[in-house]
Amino acid sequence: MNQIVVGMGDALWDCLPEGKKIGGAPANFAYHVSQFGFDSRVVSAVGADADGDEILEVFAQKGLRTQIERVPYPTGTVQVTLDAMGVPCYEIKEGVAWDNIPFTDELKRLALNTRAVCFGSLAQRNEVSRITINRFLDTMPDCEEQLKIFDINLRQGFYTKEILCDSMRRCNVLKINDEELVTISRIFGYPGIDLQDKCWILLAKYRSCIVPGDP
């Protein structure tokens, strides 16, 4: 059994008032998994620009293996500003590289040899990456040992009921926090019950293991 673990989706720069730092939940997942000795990969896309060069350089310095395509779009960034109360505000740039991850023959081979993959909703806001993520999930061997982890990670308005349904149908592990559970319940039409009952409904409908997300 192959033991490759993949973090798939957005790889970007968080541009903070004090400077920029690398971001993207899938990349963070792959990095932390690698610290336990697993063979992990980051699957994403960056632009043919300085920001893309830096992302690849940072991953290389961390010893993190990647399958990141260069595409004719700018490398993703999130502009972070503080309002008058010091609360951070986020502007997630659209039309960027990780919105356009291609499904390649190399990616198909990786899917066939992947034990676990973590993906989210944000990277599916554009059709190109959404199709690639779904093809990757559908190409993975269909057996109980494979983990398809949907870190729902709702961001602004970058999700639809269709995206959420498709992802929950394909995953067998759902990572979700209380706030996201309330949002999902409203979208799917069962808001007036407690959180535990909401979890049981999701479990019965999608037959996924549900794990708590960050607050």
Regions found by a protein language model. Name each.
Residues N2-V6, V58-A60, T66-I68, A84-P215:
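Ribokinase/PfkB-type carbohydrate-kinase core domain
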Residues I4-V5, D14-V87, E94-I101, D105:
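Substrate-binding N-lobe of the ribokinase-like
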Residues G9:
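Active-site beta-alpha turn of Rossmann-fold NAD(P)-dependent dehydrogenases/reductases
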Residues W13-D14, V182:
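Nucleotide phosphate-binding site architecture
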